[in-house]
Amino acid sequence: MSGMTEVSSLTGRLLVATPALADPNFDRAVVLLLDHDEEGSLGVVLNRPTPVDVSDILEGWADLAGEPGVVFQGGPVSLDSALGVAVIPGGASVDGAPLGWRRVHGAIGLVDLEAPPELLAKALGSLRIFAGYAGWGPGQLEDELVEGAWYVVESEPGDVSSPSPERLWREVLRRQRNELAMVATYPDDPSLN
């Protein structure tokens, strides 16, 4: 992160797709940015559950995965790879991170899925498994922000494990204390308005 100050890094924030974003991969997407620096950005889409059960691909982690217990499509890149994102209760204030968990922002962190699940079982509050991720090259995300493709908002630990991922886009917008709250009422198909 040599060229970026902590203030300008968007790591840990949410990218919320604007209604104008035309890419079907990101229609009404809520992306948690796991890394953002001068080399590019990486995140996972929090609101794209798949019909695949976690137990079908990562049996040992199934008991730790929160409801609905399915794999989420994290984005269009590397769909054959899995990422684990978990919230540690009290994680923002906990000094020592549990072995196998690396803090991204506050109580949210990445889980080493190669580690034995029992190593983290007592420490994890909620876990989501993502197939693939969303990635941007150097400056690409910044260009999309200038073009108005994304709203940038603060994340909350509960966003990772929302029990209603299909409502997350509206819920995140609705909690904003500015004009973004009104965007939550935007119709799914504006031509029917």
Curated annotation (Swiss-Prot):
GO cellular component, as recorded: cytosol
Taxonomic superkingdom: Bacteria
UniProt-listed PANTHER family: UNCHARACTERIZED PROTEIN YQGE, UPF0301 PROTEIN YQGE
Entry similarity comment: Belongs to the UPF0301 (AlgH) family.
Protein name: UPF0301 protein SAV_5129
Species assigned in the record: Streptomyces avermitilis (strain ATCC 31267 / DSM 46492 / JCM 5070 / NBRC 14893 / NCIMB 12804 / NRRL 8165 / MA-4680)
